[in-house]
């Protein structure tokens, strides 16, 4: 027994000396050898384990230590003692074994230990916080010797593990960089690219290497994947959509006019001739015209669709009855040079703006825009046809200085069955205005063959084809004497079969807004008298001659 006791004492003293030497040597190699395998073993007693709310904190650890010591004091009064253990410190963490049985009681890995605290009241006691997030526990241990060497070993272990981890990460990163660099230069050699530096940058960025940097344009060219609708791309042409009345004028307050021809579906159709509805014979006789006019919506005082006319003027037929306006009728100027059918006027037709209130149309809004001379009288020997009843006028009548002379009028018998609003009165003409008298027998015979002139107040274009002309005679043979108006008779007959006006009633549009209370004035045509200031060929001014006669425009 004595020999065994001596051997144990000698081992203890040698272990103490070795621990001191090891404690003094804190090199990395020594620490690795020290904590390798089973590690360092210490004899101690377990005070207890308490659950805490946080992972670290001195006050937290001290409070938990005092609490566990109080529990142990209560158990000692009952005859219970602290459990004897021995703990090992290694790379695997802290392991607690039972001294009697040698069984493993607790094992806490290094990454689970978050805080180590020393008891300020007892130099042989210490504790550490371990556990995962939300499940932290404080382990209190009382060593057989001073607790400082155990705390220092734990500190060295943590520091060594941290340094080894950092070194390992650096080595892995260096190895990865080396592998990447080798792969990059291997790719450069295979692809035979001229710019290896740029190739390296592209490879590191994760893009594909440039295949063909042959020209300088490839460097500044925008990739196809980045081209968008805008700066680098030509904007695509948008298809022309159909234009409707609602799109042009918005929501109309009044229903559209269903009697007028439909609006062209596309902008290109606006220049095509519209279907002939008001002049049945015009399209068949003279063919399709070159220009058409789209209908105006009824919400903006629509006057009906303007059909293409071979006279260059724009007749408004259907809705002018409701608005108090009269259809235009081309004036016949005897003695002038005839103009071919469909020949455009010397002065372009002018589109007058539509008024927004009925009855407020200016007199010049419906002026004829083209002059068409009458055909020879021999063409009218047979029965009247719509072909010879639609002559027009040119702008010479509009530019005549005698525009204030009296106009021809018609009676109201034609519209006695219609209920319409009367147009606003126009100031009466001067009584001293001269009238035009024509003494040409050819012109008189022409009127005998054509028909009778009609009044223009509230006249409708549906009845113009039924008018008859009465012969008028010259009352003044002199070409210098003022003309006298010839009386006109109105025909009460109405017919909707023909919508073509007579050649002598071509100023119906000019006469539509004059007062119905005016006295009828007579006008007799004179084939040898001329008072026009502008001939059909564009001469703005000239002296009266016996070959041309200018129609008189209303004020």
UniProtKB/Swiss-Prot annotation:
Modified residues (Phosphotyrosine): 198, 220, 232
Molecular function GO terms recorded: phosphatidylinositol 3-kinase binding; signaling adaptor activity
GO biological process terms on file: adult walking behavior; astrocyte differentiation; axonogenesis; cell adhesion; cell surface receptor signaling pathway via JAK-STAT; cell-cell adhesion involved in neuronal-glial interactions involved in cerebral cortex radial glia guided migration; cerebellum structural organization; cerebral cortex cell migration
SMART domains on file: PTB
Composition-biased stretches (Basic and acidic residues): 15-26
Keywords: Cytoplasm, Developmental protein, Differentiation, Neurogenesis, Phosphoprotein, Ubl conjugation
Biased composition (Low complexity): 470-479, 490-501
Residues modified as Phosphoserine: 491
Sequence ranges of Polar residues compositional bias: 391-403
Region listing for Disordered, in residue ranges: 1-26, 386-409, 469-555
Pfam families the record matches: DAB2_SBM (PF21792), PID (PF00640)
Domain of life: Eukaryota
Localisation: Cytoplasm
InterPro entries: DAB1/2_SBM, Dab_PTB, PH-like_dom_sf, PTB/PI_dom
Keyword Cell inner membrane recorded: no
Claim: Iron is one of the keywords in the record: no
Quaternary organization: Associates with the SH2 domains of SRC, FYN and ABL. Interacts (phosphorylated on tyrosine residues) with CRK and CRKL (via respective SH2 domain). Interacts with SIAH1, LRP8 and VLDLR. Interacts with LRP1. Interacts with APLP1 (via NPXY motif). Interacts with DAB2IP. Interacts with ZSWIM8.
Domain notes for this protein: The PID domain specifically binds to the Asn-Pro-Xaa-Tyr(P) motif found in many tyrosine-phosphorylated proteins.
Designated name of the protein: Disabled homolog 1
Protein encoded by which gene: Dab1
